[in-house]
Amino acid sequence: MEHLLHYVWKHKLFPLKVLQTTNGLPVEVIDSGLQNPNAGPDFFNAKLKIDGTLWVGNIEIHTHSSDWFRHGHNCDKAYDSVILHVVSEVDTEITRTNGEQIPQLLLTCPENVQSHYHELCVADHYPACYPILASLPKLTIHSWLTALQTERLEQKAQLIMHRLELCNSNWEDAFFITLARNFGFGLNGDAFETWAGLLPFRAMDKHRNDLFQIEAFFYGLAGLLENTFLKKEQEDEYSIRLCKEFRYLQRKFEIGQGMDVTLWRFLRLRPENFPHIRLAQLAYLYQKGDKLFSRLLEADTLTDVRALLDTRTSSYWENHYLFGRLSPQKEKTMGERSKDLIIINTVVPFLYTYGLHKTDERMCERASRFLEELKAESNHIIRSWSDAGPVSYTH
C-alpha cells in the first residue's frame, strides 16, 4: 500500500475534494517534491500551503501513522525537515525530535485502484500489464511513452543541475563528470563519478596537450598506481613512469590522494570494459581538445556527435588490459553501440538540460530528435516491452 501512496503523491492523483490535515486545515500541494531513492524522507523540497501558509520541506509517507515511531523517525534529526506526513491510516499523532507535532494528511485510494494495483503486484509476467496492452489504442501508448520520456529527461535534468551546482556552474566540468560516470556502463558508474569528482580540471588544462601527463592524473587519482594495488609482476616501466609523474604533479598542484581503489569492480567484466581501458579512452578524449560540451552543442546530427566521441588509447594500452600484463595487439576504440549508450545517457540529457536552463526550445527538440533516431538499448527490460507487442512500433 505504501508504494501505491508514493505513486499517488508523486503524480498528484488526489481526490477532487479539498485536501485537509487530520485536524481540519486545508492543504494545497503546489509541488509534490523530488522522490528520494536513498535513506531519508521519501520526497525532498516539496512546496505546500497549509491553511494558507507556504511551507517548503520534505514529505514522509507510511501506511500507518505509527510507522513513524516504529522506524525511529521521532529520534532522527534527518526527519525534522518533514512538513507533512502522508498516510492511509491515522492511528496516532507524530512528532519531531524536539516533541513538536507534524501535520498529517489522510490519503485514501479508491477500492478499484487498490484492486488493480494488487493484481499488478501479484502478476507472474513482465510487464505486469502485458495482458491489456494489446487492447489499448496505439495513440494512447504513444502519448504515454512520450510523457514518460519527458518525465525521465526532467529527472535527469534535476541530477545534472545538482552536479552543475557542485561544479560552480561550469558546464564543461559537469559534462565530463557525467560522461565519466556513464563510461562505467553501470557496474563502475559510481566509482567513475567518485574519481571524476577528484579531478583538478584547471590544473589538467595546463597539461592537456600531453597525453602521458593526463594519464598520470587519471590513473593516479583512480588509485590504480598505488603499491597496495599493483602487484609486483604488474609493475613495468610504463606504470613506474606514470607513478613518478603523478607524484610530481601532486606536489606541483598540491593534489590530494587518489580514491579508494577497492571501489573499482572487475568481476564479470570483459577486458574491454576494465577501468584501465575506459580511463585510457577518457584520457584520449580529454587530451583531444577542450570545450567538448560546447562542440556538442554545435553538433546538428548524430553523425557529428559520434565523430566528437571518437576515442582510442595511447599505444601502451593497445597490447595491455592491465599494467604489466601483455595482451594481443588491438586498437581499443569505442564501438558504435557503446557510443550510442553514451549519447542516450549523457549527451541527450545534457542538451535537454541546457535547453531548459537557457530557455532554448530548439536545443530540447534536438535532444528529443536524437533519442528518436537512436535504436533503443538492448536489455531484458526493453526486450520484454517490445515482446508485449504495441510498444515495438515506437522504435
Regions found by a protein language model. Give the residues of each.
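Short Lys/Arg-enriched alpha/beta "domain-start" segment
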Residues: 1-28
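Cysteine-centric segments in proteins
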Residues: 2, 6, 32-37, 43-45
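Active-site beta-strand-loop-beta-strand hairpin of nuclease catalytic cores
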Residues: 47-58
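Active-site ExK catalytic segment of metal-dependent nucleases
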Residues: 56-64, 85-87
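Short acidic (Asp/Glu) patches
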Residues: 64-72
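Compact, well-ordered interaction domains used in eukaryotic information-processing assemblies
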Residues: 73-78, 84
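Internal, well-ordered alpha/beta segment that forms a basic, Gly-enriched binding/recognition surface
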Residues: 86-203
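Hydrophobic, aromatic-lined core segments that form the binding pocket/scaffold
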Residues: 148-393
